[in-house]
């Protein structure tokens, strides 16, 4: 996917900002696509998003893969698959799409999907995704919907908790280092 204004990534940043205010979870957003090459305004849109990330104080919470490397990182299929496996959910706020392949990709790995209520997403997601209206629902309302989903789904809470509290760096610091210091 390409980073274009119709993808509505600014809304995703605002949603994340509100989500992080609801509770103490370390919610993060990874934006995988580079700026679309066919519209000269797209690099400017990325600059707007980077400025918004700073304004919302999300510098450590929002990651644009495109900016992580020189030359820019454009994830291959294996990397995207790994991101789906590791993710807690797919946030897809696009205002317009032709089909919505990420819904299929996230669905195949049982990832919860939170997406704009537009015809292609409705057709693909049916009743198995969480819809929001990007024109009517505020970022705070969408954040509350996402928060409530995770609060009510134990399997998803467990996955997030295990990943947050049992990363190798945490296990080493909390379990192995104390054992080694005893000797």
Give the positions of each predicted feature.
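A conserved mid-protein helix/loop that constitutes part of the nucleotide-sugar donor-binding site
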Residues: 4-20, 43, 47
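Aromatic "clamp/platform" in nucleotide-sugar-dependent glycosyltransferases that forms part
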Residues: 95
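A structural motif in glycosyltransferase catalytic domains
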Residues: 12-16, 29, 142, 175
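A short hydrophobic beta-strand element within the catalytic core of glycosyltransferases
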Residues: 90-91
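Nucleotide-activated donor-binding/catalytic signature segment of Leloir-type glycosyltransferases, i.e.
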Residues: 42-81
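A charged, aromatic-enriched C-terminal amphipathic alpha-helix characteristic of glycosyltransferases
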Residues: 150-183
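Short hydrophobic beta-strand element within catalytic cores of glycosyltransferases
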Residues: 103, 108-115
